[in-house]
C-alpha cells in the first residue's frame, strides 16, 4: 500500500497546489490527512485494478484492453474521455472552472519478457512480437503507475472544492519503445485538447522505501539507437584469405568504439556506448557476407551527444576501411531526448513535497536511463518528473 499512498499523495499535492488561486494558501497537513483517508477508502479497488493490470499486460501499441479499462475507470469518476489518441492512447479531461490546465501522464505498455515472480496474480499472457509468440510482463512498474493515476484522478475530483482549473490525464502507449509520446503529439494532443500549463509524471523505482526523489534540470539521458551493418565477402572458414570477414570487423568496432568514451569525451561528462547484440552468419565454418551490430548510446548534454555520434560513425568507417571492406550502413537512430525539469515548477512543488514528506524527500543525480516524457517538455510544457 505504501507505494500507492506515496505516489498518490505526491501527485495530488502537486496538482492541487498548482491549481489553486494565487491568493490561496495550501494547508498541507490537512490536505495530507484528507488524501490519506481517501486513499485508505479507495485502496481495495485500486489494488484490485493494479493486480488485474499486472496479470494482463500488453506491449507497445497493443494496449487495447488496458486502455479500455482505464477509460471506463475515468468515465466513472466523471472525466470526459477520448480514446485512440496516438493509436491506443487516451485523454481524460475534467473541467472545474477557470484556471490552469494540469497534465498528469501514465504509461500503458508492458515488456516482451517472462515474469518469474511466482505471484498469484503473475502474468501468463503471451503475444506475437517480432513474429514469435512471446511472454509479456509488467516489469517496469507501469501497472503501479496506472493504478496510482486512476487513484490520483479520483482523489482530486473528491477535492474539487479546493482547486479550480482543468485536469488533463493522459494514458500514453509505447513508452518502452520511445514512441508513444510522439504518436500522441502527432495525433493532435495539444491541438485537439488544451495545451497544459504544467505537466507531471512519476516512476516507481528501487530507491529507499517510501522516498520521493527528483532534481532540477536534466533528469534523464538522451537515447540514440545504434544499428551498423558491416559488409564483407563470405567464404569458407578454412580459407579466410579469400574473404573479407565482417564478423572480425564488427568485433574490432565493438572494442575500438569504446575509445570514443575514454579518449574523446570529457571524462567529467556522462556518456556510454553499450553493444547489446551482434548478428552474423549461420555456421561456425562459414564466414558470412555481413554482420549487424546493435547497441545504445546515452548522454546528458547535446554537445556530448554530437561528439559521440561523430566518433562512433568515424570509428565504424575506419574499421571497415582497415579491412578493405565496403563502407558500412550506419543508422544512429535518434530516440528520447533528456527530460529537463522546470526550475520554477520544481521550486513550487518542492514546498509541498517537503511539507508532506519531510526527510523522505531526496534530490538525486540525473538518471542514466531514458524516457519519452521529454517530448511533452520539448513541446513547451513546463514539467516535473519525479520518482517514488
Residue ranges and their predicted role:
Residues 2-23:
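Gram-negative bacterial Sec-dependent N-terminal signal peptides
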Residues 39-46, 50, 54-57, 61, ...:
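Sec/Tat-exported extracytoplasmic proteins
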Residues 29, 40-44, 60-68, 143-147, ...:
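Soluble non-cytosolic domains of exported or imported proteins
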Residues 25-26, 30, 251-388:
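Metal-dependent amide/peptide-bond hydrolase catalytic core
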Residues 53, 74, 92, 104, ...:
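Divalent metal-coordination and catalytic microenvironments
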Residues 126-137, 143-144, 155, 159-277, ...:
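Histidine/acidic-residue-rich, glycine-tolerant segments that coordinate divalent metal ions
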Residues 25-138, 147-164:
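Acidic/His- and Gly-rich active-site-bordering loop/insert found
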Amino acid at each position: 500500500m505504501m507505494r500507492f499512498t506515496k505516489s498518490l499523495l505526491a501527485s495530488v499535492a502537486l496538482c492541487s497546489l498548482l491549481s489553486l488561486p494565487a491568493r490561496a494558501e495550501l494547508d498541507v497537513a490537512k490536505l495530507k490527512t484528507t488524501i490519506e483517508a481517501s486513499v485508505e477508502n479507495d485502496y481495495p479497488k485500486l489494488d484490485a485494478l493494479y493486480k488485474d493490470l499486472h496479470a494482463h499486460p500488453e506491449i507497445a501499441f497493443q494496449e487495447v484492453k488496458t486502455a479500455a479499462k482505464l477509460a471506463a475507470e475515468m468515465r466513472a469518476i466523471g472525466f470526459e474521455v477520448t480514446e485512440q489518441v496516438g493509436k491506443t492512447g487516451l485523454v481524460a479531461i475534467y473541467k472545474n472552472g477557470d484556471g490552469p490546465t494540469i497534465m498528469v501522464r501514465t504509461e500503458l505498455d508492458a515488456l516482451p519478457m517472462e515474469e518469474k515472480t511466482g505471484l498469484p496474480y503473475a502474468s501468463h499472457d503471451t503475444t506475437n512480437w517480432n513474429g514469435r509468440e512471446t511472454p509479456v510482463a509488467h516489469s517496469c512498474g507501469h501497472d503501479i503507475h496506472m493504478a496510482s493515476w486512476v487513484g490520483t484522478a479520483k482523489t482530486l475530483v473528491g477535492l474539487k472544492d479546493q482547486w479550480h482549473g482543468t485536469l488533463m490525464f493522459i494514458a500514453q502507449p509505447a513508452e518502452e519503445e520511445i514512441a508513444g509520446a510522439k504518436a500522441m503529439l502527432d495525433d493532435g494532443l495539444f491541438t485537439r485538447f488544451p495545451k497544459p500549463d504544467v505537466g507531471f509524471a512519476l516512476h516507481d523505482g528501487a530507491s529507499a522505501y517510501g522516498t520521493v526523489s527528483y532534481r532540477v534540470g536534466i533528469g534523464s539521458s538522451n537515447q540514440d539507437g545504434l544499428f551498423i551493418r558491416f559488409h564483407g565477402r563470405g567464404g569458407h572458414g578454412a580459407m579466410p584469405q579469400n574473404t573479407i570477414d565482417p564478423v572480425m570487423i564488427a568485433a574490432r568496432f565493438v572494442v575500438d568504439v569504446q575509445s570514443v568514451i575514454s579518449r574523446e569525451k570529457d571524462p567529467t561528462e556522462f556518456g556510454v556506448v553499450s553493444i547489446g547484440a551482434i548478428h552474423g552468419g549461420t555456421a561456425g565454418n562459414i564466414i558470412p557476407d555481413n554482420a549487424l551490430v546493435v547497441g545504445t548510446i546515452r548522454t546528458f548534454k547535446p554537445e556530448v551527444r554530437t561528439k559521440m555520434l561523430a566518433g562512433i560513425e568515424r570509428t565504424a568507417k575506419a574499421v571497415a576501411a582497415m579491412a578493405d571492406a565496403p563502407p558500412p550502413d550506419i543508422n544512429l537512430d535518434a530516440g528520447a531526448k533528456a527530460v529537463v525539469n522546470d526550475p520554477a515548477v520544481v521550486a513550487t512543488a518542492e514546498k509541498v513535497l517537503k511539507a508532506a514528506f519531510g526527510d523522505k524527500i531526496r534530490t538525486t543525480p540525473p538518471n542514466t536511463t531514458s524516457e519519452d516524457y521529454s517530448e511533452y517538455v520539448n513541446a513547451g510544457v513546463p514539467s516535473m518528473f519525479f520518482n517514488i
